[in-house]
Amino acid sequence: SVAGQAIGPDGCPVPLTIDLKGVNFDFDKATLRPEAIVILDEAIAILQKYPQLKVEVAGHTDSVGTEEYNQGLSERRATTVHTYLTDKGIDAARLVGPVGFGELRPIDTNDTSEGRARNRRTELNVQN
């Protein structure tokens, strides 16, 4: 195992980030796309396998629009994912947030439409 990495009840390392690549949003939207639901269902399976995991639900936007507007939009995106997880049986006590980071934490350039699309996302970040 890697130093500092949590070990699950089965003796296997616990993922430190639950990869939600594909839980991206259409421009100016906070609704889940069909492909996002598939990915969230996979994340739910991980959360069910590791009941000790706590995760932060973090929403993000691209840089189009005002910073204030994008902050609210990122919060709505995080809330959408948070609600989906709790509706599917994940205890809200295991979820930090929902938290919105607006346009402050891009993972790609905001200079291209492809980069902006990747920045319109929600992440689950393991907290323990």
Protein language model annotation of sequence segments:
Residues 34-37, 58-128:
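Periplasmic OmpA-like peptidoglycan-binding domain that tethers envelope proteins to the cell wall
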